[in-house]
Amino acid sequence: MKTSTPKYLLFIFCLFFTINLVSAQMIRIPDGGVNLKSVAGRRVGVTDIEINWNAPGVKGREGNIWGTSVAPYGFTVLGYGSYMESPWRAGSNESTTISFSTDVSINGKPLAAGTYGFFIALYADSCTLIFNKNTKGWGSYFYNKELDVLHVTTRQRKNQPESVERLTYHFIDQTDHSVTVALDWEHWRIPINVEVDLVKTTLASIRQQLSGAMGFDPPSLETAAAWCLQNNTNYDQALSWINVVTDPNLGRIQTFTALSTKAGLLNKLDRPEESAKIMQHAMDKATALEMHGYGRQLINQGKPKEAMVVFETNYKRNKGAWPTAVGMMRGYSANGDLKKALEFGKKAL
């Protein structure tokens, strides 16, 4: 009796489906902590950094890690995979990967945003950090130097006082535009300096955010314009943003902060008459504290006489209320009249 073709195909399909279902549901058992799957992340400005690695342990091999089969020097043939000379995998099991959400520089050399396989060629007194396009490999067994994107040198710090049992990546010495990724294992530390162009990356983020619904939000536009003024960048576009904010038919925000931002941008664009007119309008809207802050700003800009006018106006308008006497003291001091400064200093107490 012949089996009909449709029934035969149905049997094959069901068998294939069952095999795949069983494979997908195979039991998973922890590896007993031999190599701990680990992740570490940090944000620098608007740049996200993430490292994924498996963390081997020293396991009694102290003094026999570096320059041995555990973490060999240079490039060695591992005997499996591509059978090519390969660097250390900077971890265990799968390839270590590192991701950057924006362009960065590594020890001063540029690296584009993306995710990379991370390897290290170890030497006695230096290390070559290797960023590679292959992020799916098993360790460095299938390392292909043709996929390398960046090589950069760093110097390891040997003889750290405390031994680190598990290979660890963590973040140290962070500033507003940089951070050092530290690989610590046994008594070695391998530092990797990461820097970002804070202004460039932040501006790109601002533009991206304002391209959506946030671009219709006056407070967001005001914040973006003020940031550009403070960071001396993107004046023309920032002025277009603040114009929307202060327009009586659009944003309708006529506060001291918004108007002074507009005045500052006009001044940066070499439009002093327009700037002065807007700044006068801003001062008419200002609170005592806002005027005081503006006067201090003028002193910091090396304009003590202009600052004195602001402090005097503030003192008279607000009838000596705090902090106007403090402003008068600062103004007289900046203009070299210490006697009058002392007089108003006593009034401020």
Range-by-range predicted roles:
Residues 1-27:
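Bacterial Sec-dependent N-terminal signal peptides
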Residues 52-113, 119-221:
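Extended, well-structured beta-strand/loop surface patches
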Residues 25, 50-51:
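Charge-dense, helix-prone N-terminal extensions
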Residues 219-331:
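Alpha-helical adaptor scaffolds
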Residues 267, 283-286, 333-349:
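TPR/TPR-like (Sel1-like) alpha-helical repeat modules
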Residues 26-45:
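Short N-terminal segments immediately surrounding and downstream of signal-peptide cleavage
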